[in-house]
């Protein structure tokens, strides 16, 4: 009602809505106070709206934009202001969002927005230019990023009325954004961070602490381990540079250096040191509301449990909490960490749907996290036995990793591809790839990346010296976690006819979960769950009403 009152300026919207929705099969009242309209009704309403004079349409769209912006729904606000041709307002929304929700759009949508705004309007919004520069970097649109920088500098020159403080903040923040052109070269990035810090008296506007720090990557170490043999130096550089970055961004990415330290310790098999660094990271980010860093901590913690021989599950309560925040990136990070861990444990059915069904192409991942996502998908392919798919995609993925100086991700992909060749009986190819992987891992003693796929490579690993033997030993510990996971799901003989998916549904039915809860845990729709339940009853020859069949299924499970 509140939104309708604001958009229409009608005082009696409550009565109008009541009349429109009472006993109307085309409208459903939602628990939160909103409404769901049948697509036919929406089409009719849209047709009537399109018949209004253009100026009247623009007035309503501008009101939509204002309402959405005031309620933090920046993407909807941006769309509405664009339809109204209100480019100044659209750029104000870009500034307010600080590029956080903007990341969910396709790059082409934002490029079209820039073209429609025009340079003169853009130069009146220098802070929005900073936000757009950073987003262009994450989309790999570097020439456009440089064009926006030129507009920013021209804007500063054309506004002699700016105070020295305003000018310093804009130029300093420009240095901060330009540092991303040296992404994952910690020394060069820090040089520009220090330059920004010298010029800025206020905190950055284009980077907010509530936004993503890892661009969607679940790991800090995968982003910043650049050169084999230089891990200790990279950790020291990160320790040195982050305080300067925190100063000008209000603590954006707080705890990143501790997470990287913990991930490095885990990669080297120093589990106690990794656990200490993890707790320090959690203490650093406590109360900051930085979900990105908390999710990276979760990933480190799950892999620590696995390295200790424990099975880890998918924390669906945590996922529901993230879902309520309406930030797709947090969900994708969560799904990627769950996918990787469940794949390493060999629990293919528990892998989130985005990765299990290989739908990564439906998501607009930011460029810096794409190699990590594809590496995790590789791990899923291994768990599913799709070894040829791993091999087929490895050449392009390795080239991408090398081009971005992602030494750790490259190491993982080499090991995965070696595992795929070994499973297909191609020992010579597997040994050559494992030799390349060992050459990357040896200088820094990175044992865990080899161990996490050790169950595929156990016969080969001992041939690679102390590192290989340690990896083989750790892989046996990891196998305990896989064994524990399998024991948790050991299937009685009566359920032998069921597929893995049907068995997963049947287990949850026996635990008296509702269809909605089963759907949530297995990343299915309720309709699909009902189909599986009918198939289960048919295969197990269970008859009677729904309650009788469910009780009989529980009895079979007990037997």
Language-model segments: which ranges?
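Extended alpha-helical scaffolding segments used for macromolecular assembly and cargo binding
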Residues: 47, 51-128, 132-135, 148
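Linker/hinge segments immediately adjacent to helix-turn-helix/homeobox DNA-binding domains
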Residues: 374-396, 400-409, 414-427, 431-500, ...
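Amphipathic alpha-helical segments of tetratricopeptide repeats
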Residues: 22, 78, 98-99, 114-119, ...
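Alpha-solenoid helical repeat architecture
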Residues: 74-76, 86-87, 125, 162-172, ...
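Recognition helix of helix-turn-helix DNA-binding domains
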Residues: 512-551
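C-terminal boundary/linker of central alpha/beta nucleotide-binding cores
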Residues: 1-50, 59-62
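Internal alpha-solenoid helical repeat scaffolds
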Residues: 121-297
């Amino acid at each position: 009602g509140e939104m309708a009152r604001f958009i229409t300026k009608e005082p009696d919207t409550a009565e109008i809505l009541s009349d429109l929705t009472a006993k109307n099969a085309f409208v459903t009242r939602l628990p939160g106070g909103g409404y769901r309209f049948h697509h036919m009704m929406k089409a009719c309403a849209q047709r009537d709206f399109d018949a209004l004079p253009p100026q009247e349409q623009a007035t309503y769209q501008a009101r939509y934009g204002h309402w959405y912006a005031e309620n933090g729904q920046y993407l909807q606000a941006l769309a509405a202001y664009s339809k109204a041709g209100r480019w100044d307002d659209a750029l104000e929304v870009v500034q307010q969002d600080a590029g956080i929700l903007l990341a969910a759009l396709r790059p082409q949508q934002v490029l079209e927005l820039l073209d429609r705004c025009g340079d003169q309007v853009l130069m009146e919004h220098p802070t929005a230019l900073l936000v757009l520069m950073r987003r262009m970097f994450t989309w790999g649109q570097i020439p456009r990023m440089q064009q926006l920088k030129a507009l920013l500098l021209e804007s500063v020159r054309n506004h002699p009325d700016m105070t020295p403080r305003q000018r310093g903040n804009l130029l300093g923040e420009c240095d901060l954004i330009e540092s991303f052109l040296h992404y994952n070269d910690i020394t060069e990035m820090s040089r520009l961070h220090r330059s920004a810090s010298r010029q800025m008296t206020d905190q950055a506007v284009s980077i907010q602490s509530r936004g993503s720090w890892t661009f969607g990557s679940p790991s800090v170490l995968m982003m910043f381990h650049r050169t084999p043999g230089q891990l200790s130096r990279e950790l020291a550089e990160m320790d040195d540079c982050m305080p300067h970055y925190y100063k000008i961004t209000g603590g954006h990415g707080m705890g990143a250096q501790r997470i990287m330290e913990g991930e490095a310790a885990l990669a080297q098999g120093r589990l106690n040191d990794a656990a200490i660094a993890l707790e320090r990271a959690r203490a650093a980010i406590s109360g900051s509301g930085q979900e990105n860093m908390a999710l990276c901590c979760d990933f480190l913690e799950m892999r620590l449990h696995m390295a200790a021989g424990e099975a880890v599950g998918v924390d669906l309560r945590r996922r529901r909490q993230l879902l309520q925040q309406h930030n797709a990136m947090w969900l994708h990070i969560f799904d990627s960490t769950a996918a990787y861990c469940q794949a390493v444990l060999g629990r293919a059915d528990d892998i989130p749907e985005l990765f299990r069904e290989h739908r990564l192409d439906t998501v607009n991942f930011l460029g810096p996290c794409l190699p990590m996502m594809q590496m995790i998908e590789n791990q899923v392919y291994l768990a599913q036995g799709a070894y040829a798919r791993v091999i087929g995609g490895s050449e392009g993925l390795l080239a991408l990793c090398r081009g971005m100086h992602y030494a750790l991700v490259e190491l993982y992909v080499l090991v995965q591809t070696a595992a795929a060749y070994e499973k297909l009986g191609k020992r010579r190819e597997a040994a050559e790839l494992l030799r390349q992987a060992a050459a990357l891992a040896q200088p820094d003693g990175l044992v865990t990346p080899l161990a996490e796929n050790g169950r595929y490579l156990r016969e080969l690993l001992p041939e690679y010296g102390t590192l290989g033997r340690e990896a083989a030993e750790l892989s046996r510990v990891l196998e305990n976690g896989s064994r524990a996971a399998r024991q948790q799901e050991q299937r009685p003989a009566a359920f032998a006819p069921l597929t893995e998916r049907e068995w997963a549904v049947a287990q949850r039915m026996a635990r008296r979960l509702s269809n909605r809860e089963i759907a949530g845990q297995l990343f299915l729709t309720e309709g699909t769950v009902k189909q599986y339940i009918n198939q289960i009853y048919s295969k197990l020859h269970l008859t009677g009403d729904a309650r009788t069949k469910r009780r009989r299924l529980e009895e079979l499970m007990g037997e």
